[in-house]
Amino acid sequence: MNIDFPFQQPSLYGYKLNELKSILSPAFRAKQIYHWLYHRYENDAMRMDNISKTMQNYIREHFALSQIYPIRVEHSIDGSKKYLFETYDGHCFESVLIQMRDKKLGHKGEVVESEKWTMCLSSQIGCKVGCAFCFTAKGGFVRNLHASEIVEQVVIMKKDNQMAPHKRVNIVYMGMGEPLDNIENVTRAIEILSESEGLSISARRQTISTSGIAPKIKQLGKLNLGVQLAISLHAVDDKLRSQLIPMNKAYNISDILTEVRAFPIDTRKKVMFEYLMIKGVNDDLKSAKKLLQLLNGIKAKVNLILFNPHEGSTFKRPEINDVRAFADFLIKRGLLCTIRESRGIDISAACGQLREKVKAENVSCETLT
């Protein structure tokens, strides 16, 4: 069992159930504790009232529970929420909860409305990749988040929104950081979150988004977790992509697509290619044609994202008519393509807007306790 804990005491959120069973006696206590952590969202051992005082004291003495603390949540007019977390060592990072509502016809012809939740998790404090369009990159890199800190983001957001333990949510590793630069902790978090006795969030409902570290895509594929893959492509030639994403100089488009073609994907799923559209940079039909050629033979879905303005950037948001023309070009030629509806722009929670810096802004926010 190789668990990297930076704390004086290891966090219970960093253990898989079988690992906890191997260190607690009797072993059934592990299942009880898992139930308290992930079904009751309890983070105080002394309130776990179906375990003995001896076990409560043992947990308190040998383990930590909360290692990240929600210090603020901002509410968007579209229902999204941005959470600001502080870590045990005094750093801050952000995650986003996205609420979407679906309407469909019921079996009697009535309109049925349902809500869907997506949690956009951070994997690092800051980021090393340095994408030219991303606000996170402006703050530099601080450190990796540990598996327990990734898992606890989900627990806190579920608890704060009074979600049932097995309420279906989608997880996207698209917050702060490059997930494959922290692959050990991210994949451990995926396994913990998918534990059937815990939150039971299937790996098929979890998506790792990467800027394209080709060897790590290969490593992830060999683990065969069943997780979904998203590639932050954003350009169709290496010259432009290297300007937007400096890592492209190490792992170019061809390197990335070679590993994508070999990546194990559920027969019902597709690899998502994220394409950030920037006015006058990559939003023309010539780029659409090249993108179509690049993805030929790949089970692909293209997600077009409109650039979200942020402090210090000279890039501009594209015209919606250009975005629609780009999408129509791909769709008419058989490539599945969607235009992402940006969520949380008013609270700087949209794609590319997250950053560690705590800003004194006049926004609707509350302190969590």
Curated annotation (Swiss-Prot):
Residues the record lists as binding S-adenosyl-L-methionine: G177, E178, S209, S232, L233, H234, N308
Active site per UniProt: E94 (proton acceptor), C351 (s-methylcysteine intermediate)
Broad EC category: transferase
Database matches in Pfam families: Radical_SAM, RlmN_N
Superkingdom as given in the UniProt entry: Bacteria
Annotated compartments: Cytoplasm
Binding site for [4Fe-4S] cluster: C127, C131, C134
Cofactor: [4Fe-4S] cluster
Assigned GO CC terms: cytoplasm
Gene Ontology terms for molecular function: 4 iron, 4 sulfur cluster binding; metal ion binding; rRNA (adenine(2503)-C2-)-methyltransferase activity; rRNA binding; tRNA (adenine(37)-C2)-methyltransferase activity; tRNA binding
Enzyme Commission number(s): 2.1.1.192
Disulfide bonds: C120-C351
Substrates-to-products reaction catalysed: adenosine(2503) in 23S rRNA + 2 reduced [2Fe-2S]-[ferredoxin] + 2 S-adenosyl-L-methionine = 2-methyladenosine(2503) in 23S rRNA + 5'-deoxyadenosine + L-methionine + 2 oxidized [2Fe-2S]-[ferredoxin] + S-adenosyl-L-homocysteine; adenosine(37) in tRNA + 2 reduced [2Fe-2S]-[ferredoxin] + 2 S-adenosyl-L-methionine = 2-methyladenosine(37) in tRNA + 5'-deoxyadenosine + L-methionine + 2 oxidized [2Fe-2S]-[ferredoxin] + S-adenosyl-L-homocysteine
InterPro entries on file: Aldolase_TIM, Methyltransferase_A, RlmN_N, RNA_MTrfase_RlmN, rRNA_lsu_MTrfase_RlmN/Cfr, rSAM
Role: Specifically methylates position 2 of adenine 2503 in 23S rRNA and position 2 of adenine 37 in tRNAs. m2A2503 modification seems to play a crucial role in the proofreading step occurring at the peptidyl transferase center and thus would serve to optimize ribosomal fidelity.
Family: Belongs to the radical SAM superfamily. RlmN family.
UniProt-recorded name of the protein: Dual-specificity RNA methyltransferase RlmN
Lineage start: Bacteria, Pseudomonadati, Campylobacterota, Epsilonproteobacteria, Campylobacterales
